[in-house]
Amino acid sequence: MSRRHAAEKRVILPDMKYNSILLSRFINNIMKEGKKALAEKIVYSAFNKIEKKHRVDPYQTFNNAMHNVKPHLEVTSVRVGGANYQVPTHVDERRGYALASRWIINAASKRSEKMMIDKLAEELFEASNNRGVAIKKKEDTHKMAEANKAFSHFSPKKMK
């Protein structure tokens, strides 16, 4: 692994329908085995289902869900004197949204509905209303960071 310079961040184009880079990243996370058209179909169909069932703007619901699930703190493992400590660190915005989308997708796939469209629609709606498994995951992460607040003086190098 080269240490000369950091890798360049790829430019991700916004999605066609809502012109949003955040939604485009979410679609890329849904995508499996390069089947982007299928991932787009799942997301846009879930948006249609949200609009029909709950009579709310699906894009606004998506943004609210992502904002509600995005963590502000997480713990990173730091080795000090032969012992590993779970040190709470702040999460930057890009990583926060990446974690949020991953948690929403995992929570949706574990739901009991039959089709991924239904699962995703319900999980997004619940997350936008501060309910659901993805919100619980965020709260657990924050509790873990709060419990390990005593080790915050062992901040990792990236925080200095």
From Swiss-Prot:
One of the primary rRNA binding proteins, it binds directly to 16S rRNA where it nucleates assembly of the head domain of the 30S subunit. Is located at the subunit interface close to the decoding center, probably blocks exit of the E-site tRNA. SUPFAM superfamilies: Ribosomal protein S7. One of its GO terms (biological process) is translation. Part of the 30S ribosomal subunit. Contacts proteins S9 and S11. This is Small ribosomal subunit protein uS7. It holds the Pfam family Ribosomal_S7. GO terms for molecular function: rRNA binding; structural constituent of ribosome; tRNA binding. The gene is rpsG. Keywords: Ribonucleoprotein, Ribosomal protein, RNA-binding, rRNA-binding, tRNA-binding. It comes from Rickettsia africae (strain ESF-5). Belongs to the universal ribosomal protein uS7 family. It comes from the Bacteria. NCBIfam families: rpsG_bact. InterPro entries: Ribosomal_uS7, Ribosomal_uS7_bac/org-type, Ribosomal_uS7_CS, Ribosomal_uS7_dom, Ribosomal_uS7_dom_sf. The keyword RNA-binding applies. GO terms for cellular component: small ribosomal subunit.
